[in-house]
């Protein structure tokens, strides 16, 4: 894949125009996705059908001019493999029937076995069969902290009060759980690479719940352990790693470490200031506010070209959203965004 704009950017090689992909590019805003989704009462059942996942991953590739595909799956597959009882029902977010509510629940967890997630690895293989040979596939996982937050809370939440209380009352038990998740994430990502992904992204979707100090203690140190293991492993050592931290309270420049190829910026982050601070030492991905896609074509053009002009001379720039695309977006607005970034 020597001619991949996306992989070139991750190696800090200049491109004539920035490579483009976007978070949740296969998803609910696409009518063709909805046609398949209506056949499943539980989203997770759909994720467990590799051929269906491959079709869904290809939908945005067939519709738009994109430079990378991302595996169609969910970040919560690891807690589900730990027997926490994950389910997604129409109109609801994720729910766990067996959440972590006390330290003893961690001691009685079943051992993580990546083979229970063979449906994910089969989805990688099926997706690679359908993708153009020159188009990279991104694999991913949630960060240990983000997976722990969902697992303790029992699902999504506005304030994650149960998780914060658990962190305050049982920090040692939480660290034990984070170690389990850390090892599981490494093994999970390693198997994705063996199955054919070309790059990896770690989503710390609940980084914003933590103070700057707690982010280092409960999140970053475990993310670093994952990347260190990946970079020490002959199977995965050459695979680029992207980190997405959602609106962290730490400076972004303090979140960059040697094993990362790319930092993916939340839309609230100042991409101009950050690009000047890191001085071409790491690829930067982002960071259009997804809400801009609800605006007029003129405003979309202005915002996209503002970001692209800031990053014009930055060799490792990947155009993306600063968070996942929302279900209400008209696909034609995505087309406008891509056209603006290509000019």
Question: Locations of the language-model features?
Answer:
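Active-site loop segments of alpha/beta catalytic cores
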Residues: 116-343
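Generic structural hydrophobic/aromatic packing signal, biased to beta-strands
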Residues: 10, 20, 69, 96, ...
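N-terminal basic, low-complexity leaders that serve as flexible interaction/assembly modules and, when applicable
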Residues: 1-90, 225, 309, 329-343
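A gly/proline- and charged-residue-enriched helix-loop-helix capping module
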Residues: 91-130
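N-terminal small/glycine-rich loop or linker at the start of catalytic domains
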Residues: 14-45, 75-90, 96-102, 138-175, ...
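Short, glycine- and charge-enriched coil/turn segments that flank and shape catalytic ligand pockets
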Residues: 1, 39-40, 102-112, 172, ...
């Amino acid at each position: 894949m020597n001619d991949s704009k996306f992989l070139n950017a991750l190696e800090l090689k200049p491109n004539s125009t920035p490579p483009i992909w976007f978070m949740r590019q296969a998803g609910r805003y696409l009518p063709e996705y909805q046609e398949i989704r209506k056949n499943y009462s539980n989203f997770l059942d759909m994720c467990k059908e590799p051929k269906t996942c491959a079709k869904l991953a290809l939908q945005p590739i067939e519709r738009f001019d994109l430079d990378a595909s991302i595996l169609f799956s969910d970040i919560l597959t690891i807690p589900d493999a730990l027997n926490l009882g994950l389910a997604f029902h129409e109109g609801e977010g994720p729910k766990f029937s067996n959440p972590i509510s006390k330290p003893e629940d961690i001691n009685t967890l079943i051992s993580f076995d990546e083979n229970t997630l063979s449906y994910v690895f089969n989805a990688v293989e099926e997706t690679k069969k359908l993708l153009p040979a020159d188009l990279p596939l991104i694999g991913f996982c949630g960060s240990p902290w983000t997976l722990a937050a969902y697992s303790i809370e029992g699902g999504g939440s506005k304030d994650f009060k149960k998780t914060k209380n658990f962190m305050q009352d049982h920090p040692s038990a939480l660290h034990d759980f984070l170690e389990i998740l850390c090892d599981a994430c490494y093994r999970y990502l390693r198997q994705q690479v063996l199955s054919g992904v070309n790059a990896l992204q770690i989503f710390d979707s609940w980084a914003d719940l933590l103070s700057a100090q707690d982010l280092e203690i409960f999140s970053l140190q475990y993310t670093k352990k994952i990347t260190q293991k990946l970079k020490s492993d002959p199977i995965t050592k050459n695979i680029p790693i992207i980190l997405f931290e959602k609106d962290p309270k730490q400076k972004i420049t303090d979140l960059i470490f040697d094993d990362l190829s790319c930092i993916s910026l939340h839309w609230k982050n100042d991409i101009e200031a950050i690009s000047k601070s890191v001085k071409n030492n790491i690829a930067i991905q982002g960071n259009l506010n997804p809400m801009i896609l609800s605006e007029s074509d003129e405003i979309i053009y202005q915002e996209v070209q503002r970001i692209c002009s800031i990053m014009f001379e930055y060799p490792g720039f990947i155009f993306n959203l600063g968070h996942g695309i929302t279900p209400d977006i008209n696909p034609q607005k995505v087309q406008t965004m891509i056209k603006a970034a290509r000019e």
